Amino acid sequence: MTRGFTPSLPVEFPKMGSFRRPRPRFMSSPALSDLPRFQAARQALQLSSNSAWNSVQTAVINVFKGGGLQSNELYALNENIRRLLKSELGSFITDYFQNQLLAKGLLFVEEKIKLCEGENRIEVLAEVWDHFFTETLPTLQAIFYPVQGQELTIRQISLLGFRDLVLLKVKLEDLLLLAQPQLPSSIVQMLLILQSVHEPTGPSEGYLQLEELVKQVVSPFLGISEDRGLSGPTYTLARRHSRVRPKVTLLNYASPITPVSRPLNEMALTPLTEQEGEAYLEKCGSVRRHTVANAHSDIQLLAMATMMHSGLGEESGGEDKCLLLQPSFPPPHRQCSSEPNITDGPDEPEQGATGSQEDSELNCASLS
């Protein structure tokens, strides 16, 4: 019996999806027919930026001319500036405001002041400053409120522009001397506010010229003077209309203070610091800083103040300047006047008491 041969049939299994990700279909390069559409979109964006900037420029010039903002105009200007910050012009808004808009707006202010002569120019300058400080400056800050995080703020840029483009071009040196008895308070306010604005690169020539004007109307005056012999600026304290004759007074007090070396470039107007820490307590022997044992130092300060102002009842003299000099015993930091003297050993107080007075001289020079 022969076995029949049964042909095998192919078995079909259910097909599963491929685990391999399909190849991405790359877009073909844009056709030449799409270029007009791209150019039209870019031109529309540029037109939108130009329209936004033109609205800002028109509003700023109108503010300098004495006008104000319309209803809801401030919101629209802020939105336009936010849109400009996101565009290609975003990094140039501050520079364009400083070099173009501010210069053009302050030109109207300068021309208004130069139309007057003599003492009338002082009065017009006071009125212009009042309007600029109370109306124009706050409006400019509100318009450019979205512009933040710059090296100089809109307020500082505007005040520096008023100083350089208006005040220093009016030439008030002679006018301030003539109008000294009846000088408007707005002029003094203007000079002090402009003096408080500093450039990030240090005192400029315009700042030094401004200080010469402040020096004529403010007494006592504390300012910065450039000394060619020193590496940095020098702080000068000047007093006008002094009633004492120019003289140099040397106050000498014997005090057991050990001189400590101090670098020359360190400013004399460093802030007061108090000694703290365990090492200080061990050195002073757990003695409180404020004791009666060191009351002579307070007496020295009172004597200094009395001798400096002892000539107030004398006849009037010329201009008086008091230079803030470094004492001959400069410590590494300024200590409080009632701080006890600290010695390194028990034998040093007697030695310090019999030492030379040259190491403990306190120099106060009153020069003219």
Curated annotation (Swiss-Prot):
UniProt keyword terms in alphabetical order: Phosphoprotein, Signal transduction inhibitor, Ubl conjugation
Coiled-coil residues: none
Renumbered residue ranges of the record's region Disordered: 312-368
InterPro entries: Bit61/PRR5
Pfam families (UniProt xref): HbrB
Leader peptide range in chain numbering: none
Post-translational modification summary for this protein: Ubiquitinated. Ubiquitination by RFFL promotes proteasomal degradation of PRR5L thereby modifying the substrate-specific activity of the mTORC2 complex. Ubiquitination by RFFL is stimulated by LPA/lysophosphatidic acid.
Function, as annotated: Associates with the mTORC2 complex that regulates cellular processes including survival and organization of the cytoskeleton. Regulates the activity of the mTORC2 complex in a substrate-specific manner preventing for instance the specific phosphorylation of PKCs and thereby controlling cell migration. Plays a role in the stimulation of ZFP36-mediated mRNA decay of several ZFP36-associated mRNAs, such as TNF-alpha and GM-CSF, in response to stress. Required for ZFP36 localization to cytoplasmic stress granule (SG) and P-body (PB) in response to stress.
Family of this protein: Belongs to the PROTOR family.
Name used for this protein in its record: Proline-rich protein 5-like
Taxon lineage: Eukaryota, Metazoa, Chordata, Craniata, Vertebrata
Encoding gene, per UniProt annotation: PRR5L
